[in-house]
Every structure is written in C-alpha cells, then in structure tokens.
Amino acid sequence: MADDSELYPRFFKVFLVESASESLMIPLPFMAFLADPLPKTVKLQGLGGKLWTVSLKKISGAAYLTRGWPKFAEEHELKNGEFMTFVYDGHRTFEVSVFDRWGSKEVRAEIQAIPLSDSDSDSVVEDEKDSTDVVEDDDDEDEDEDEDDDGSFDEDEEISQSLYPIDEETATDAAVFEGNLDVEALTNPHFPTTLKNRIYELLIPANVVKDNNLEFGSSIKYIDGEGTLVGLRGKWADKRVCFKGWDRICRRNRLKKHQDTVECELLHDDQKMVHSIRVHVLRRDA
C-alpha cells in the first residue's frame, strides 16, 4: 500500500493513554471514506506484517475502534505522545505506521519467520491438504503440476507464516469481485488462473513479468471481496516470481476446480513495482 500511498486516504492520531487505551476515535472528516452503514470490523496491519481484527462502532455520530484496539496498542507498546498514520485501502483494512515522539518510524510487533527442515515442510503441506475441502485429489494432475513446477525450494529457505490469518466474516463486498468481468477493459497487467493442486503459491507468469517490465518486492497484498491479505514471496532456485498464501484466497472464495477462473490484476506504482494483486473471481455454472 505504501508504494501507491498517494491514492489512499489517510489520517493521523496522537496516542494519549488517558483517552486512547481502550478505544480510538476516527476523525469526523474521515468518515466520508467509510462505508455507510459502517462495517462491524476492520483490519489493522502493522509494519511488522501482522493483522489485527478490530471492532468499528458508531458512538454519538463518531466512529471508534473498540474491541481489539487495546491488544493492538499493547502489542505495539504505544507510549504517550507517539503518533500513528492510518492509510485506508477502501476494503476494510488500515495500514498503520507508528512514529516515536521524535518522528522516527518504528517497526513493532513483527511476525517471526519459522525455519523448517525439508521433511517438516513436506509434513505441513500434507496436513494442510488433509484439512482443506477445496482441492480434490487427482494424481494425474499432480504429475502434470510437478512437470510445470520443476523448480525446487532452496535448501536453506525459511518457510514462514506466509499469510497473516484473518477472522472469517460474511463477505458483504464479494459481489464486487464476482460475475461478468470485461477483461479487455482492465488497464493494469493481468493474467488468468484456476484452482490447481498446488494452491499454496501463486505463480506470476514469466511473460507477464517480462512484457510489462514489472518488479516485485518481498511481499504482496491480495485484495478480494473480503479485504486484504499479505503473502510473502517464495524462494525458488530458478528465480521464478511466486507468492505464498494463495491457498487462503482459494479457500475463502470457495473456488471450484474446472469451474471457476480468477483474473489476477497486478497493481503497481510509477516505477512498475507491483504492490497488490486484485482478485476477480469469475464463476461458471456446473
């Protein structure tokens, strides 16, 4: 979000212990950027990568961050006089930056990467396959997928929590991203994909990257009808561009094999640095 921050509305707040420990009021002029009626919850994403679910309530005509806010404040160790900027992506997620009293940006409440051995990584993947009701077993397609994905993880790769979990909610905005999409009308680079056996990573086609001179950082933001999720970049020996956490998008959008298509729209800044992937789900009746 920060790479394209001028496109997003924002506000700043000074943290005062006596008034902001239990709840935080959103400035009244900023309410024009929020949905009416207000969503019941929003997501706060810190610079450390984690996501917090926080209740949003209207009290005496003003919007307040309530349940969940004290935990955010505690885990960020907010001190009296420090201030924060809140950048809103329009999809119920705020990116929050914390500055100390001298104006230096602080990175706090960082998510920790967990290094796993190759055997541990395999067992995690198998456990996740057992727990999902989206992907159907298909040995033939597994073999085809392995041929397409012949790269292997580096031996010293750290497998981290690639997507920061989000609480399940009713997808009130899902219709915006589903239905008949005019692909030709998209002005940003884009590509189609379908539900595959290897759902844990989203591979960006090499020709799309090359033809559009795109650059990618260490993480990407997925945007769908429920909000945003952050996926970390995978490490491959052949330098292919892929991002983890795609399985969460597949599951929460209930994608079906041989039936649904996803058009992935790559949002980038003026320097061709891709910061977000907007997910358009195209349903096809069985």
From Swiss-Prot:
> Which positions does the record tag as DNA-binding?
9-102
Report the locations given in the UniProt record: Nucleus
**What GO molecular function terms would the record report?**
sequence-specific DNA binding
Tell me which SMART domains the record gives.
B3 (SM01019)
Disordered: annotated span: 117-161
Top-level division of the source organism's lineage:
Eukaryota
Q: What is its main location?
A: nucleus
Do you know which Pfam families this protein is assigned to? B3 (PF02362)
Q: Name one GO biological process term.
A: regulation of photoperiodism, flowering
Name under which the protein is recorded: B3 domain-containing protein REM20
